């Protein structure tokens, strides 16, 4: 009985992937690639692009923010998908 219970606990942990956090790129357009672990419950990454006097600006991070008109936003839900 103990073996069965232990097996069920292990299977549950493996299937639920407890403690898993999404990883997203967070480097600005002109910087080397970096990524970070998102807060628990944050399951998406974003890539936000716009143009100003410096050229095309790219911002990356966790979540899927609301943006103003004229800003291109791409949201995705896999590891490091926002490059």
From Swiss-Prot:
Q: What is this protein called?
A: Short neurotoxin OKI-17/NCA-06
Q: Where is the signal peptide?
A: 1-21
Its source organism is Laticauda laticaudata
* Entry similarity comment: Belongs to the three-finger toxin family. Short-chain subfamily. Type I alpha-neurotoxin sub-subfamily.
CDD domains noted in UniProt: TFP_snake_toxin
| Location of this chain's protein in the cell | Secreted
Instruction: Name the cystine pairs.
Output: 24-45, 38-62, 64-75, 76-81
Cited Gene3D superfamilies: CD59 (2.10.60.10)
One GO location term (cellular component): extracellular region
Which keywords does UniProt give here? Acetylcholine receptor inhibiting toxin, Disulfide bond, Ion channel impairing toxin, Neurotoxin, Postsynaptic neurotoxin, Secreted, Signal, Toxin
Q: Which GO molecular function annotation, any one, does this entry have?
A: ion channel regulator activity
Q: Give expression by tissue.
A: Expressed by the venom gland.
Q: What does this protein do?
A: Binds to muscle nicotinic acetylcholine receptor (nAChR) and inhibit acetylcholine from binding to the receptor, thereby impairing neuromuscular transmission.
Pfam entry (one) = Toxin_cobra-type
Q: Which PROSITE patterns match?
A: SNAKE_TOXIN
């Amino acid at each position: 009985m103990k073996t069965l219970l232990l097996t069920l606990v292990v299977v549950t942990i493996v299937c639920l992937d407890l403690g898993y956090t999404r990883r997203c790129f967070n480097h600005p357009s002109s910087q080397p690639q970096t990524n970070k672990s998102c807060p628990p419950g944050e399951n998406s990454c974003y890539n936000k692009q716009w143009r100003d006097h410096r050229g095309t600006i790219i911002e990356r991070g966790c979540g899927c923010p609301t943006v103003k008109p004229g800003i291109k936003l791409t949201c995705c839900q896999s590891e490091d998908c926002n490059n």
